[in-house]
């Protein structure tokens, strides 16, 4: 369950998406995650260049004052994986819509479900 996984993390987290702030907020609301992320939302619309450029991920790292090399990105698209790799971040790719092979080729470590992701986050490769 994504809610339990998020709550188990003791690190800063955010959402960094190519969507508008309104779209991101709506999706968080529908997933009952608004309270967990609060204002930690970064939109590709609000940076000079959207994904596959690294701008939205770099803006998030800067806002948290964290080196990109210390960030972990969870992505579900090759475009997003490319952006995170370009930002110098480690990427785990959720193979729900995009294939594991495509995510791996873009530079992600693919995972199929939240149990696998939990293992990756708590025991990084």
What residue ranges belong to the model's regions?
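Thiol/selenol-based redox catalytic cores and closely related redox-interacting motifs
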Residues: 14
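Asp-based, Mg2+/Mn2+-dependent phosphohydrolase catalytic module
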Residues: 3-4, 11, 20-125
